[in-house]
């Protein structure tokens, strides 16, 4: 797999990665119907297309030349000092092979002036939490409000960068 910038031709494959990964991660916890409702809204082609042109952001895919195996999207805020990782997903069948780390490294390299990277993660997504902690993220709090994907507080993680 190699990491590259996502393009409009990738949108169907990106959506497929997101839908499959979300169902694999959340169906047992929240139910397939709720997950489908969310992926239909958040991962629609129109929503994904808007991310391609969002200023101060980077949208990446992990590609082996035959298929998209992972996606990542992040944007900088606070004058470029902070990167917010909005999405990092790898197909379940490809997890544990370093693809997530490759995507994360490339996201960080895309924002050389950033001093930190921040993300929010569902408290029940223990696999993602373990991944982020193994990659230097430290829990810095939670949203404190029922704003998460499923109406629950999300955990906030942060990692300092060289900047």
Summary of predicted features, one role per range:
Residues 1-3:
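Extreme N-terminal starter segment of soluble prokaryotic enzymes
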Residues 99-111, 116-117, 124, 128:
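A structural feature recognizing the 12-helix transmembrane core of secondary solute carriers
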